[in-house]
Amino acid sequence: MPQMAPLNWAMMTIMFSLSLLVSMIILYSNFNSTPPTKMKMKTSQKLIWKW
């Protein structure tokens, strides 16, 4: 099925970029948070909603 190959590749790329974005957000919130975990959760949620 040659027609399905580009679609699968696009889906894989999209999923990879999404996971990369999520991991970057998590890393960013981890590096930027000196307050306790509750605040960290709040900020990460805010970041996710912003995206």
Swiss-Prot record:
Topology in the lipid bilayer? Single-pass membrane protein
InterPro entries given in the database record: ATP8_metazoa
Q: Name one GO cellular component term.
A: proton-transporting ATP synthase complex
Name of the protein described by the UniProt record? ATP synthase protein 8
Q: What does the similarity note say? A: Belongs to the ATPase protein 8 family.
Q: What does this protein do?
A: Mitochondrial membrane ATP synthase (F(1)F(0) ATP synthase or Complex V) produces ATP from ADP in the presence of a proton gradient across the membrane which is generated by electron transport complexes of the respiratory chain. F-type ATPases consist of two structural domains, F(1) - containing the extramembraneous catalytic core and F(0) - containing the membrane proton channel, linked together by a central stalk and a peripheral stalk. During catalysis, ATP synthesis in the catalytic domain of F(1) is coupled via a rotary mechanism of the central stalk subunits to proton translocation.
Gene Ontology MF annotations: proton transmembrane transporter activity
* Chief place of localization: mitochondrion
Listed under GO biological process in this entry are: proton motive force-driven ATP synthesis
Q: What subcellular compartments does it reside in? A: Mitochondrion membrane
- Keywords per UniProt: ATP synthesis, CF(0), Hydrogen ion transport, Ion transport, Membrane, Mitochondrion, Transmembrane, Transmembrane helix, Transport
Q: What residue ranges are annotated as transmembrane? A: 7-27
Q: What is its quaternary makeup? A: F-type ATPases have 2 components, CF(1) - the catalytic core - and CF(0) - the membrane proton channel.
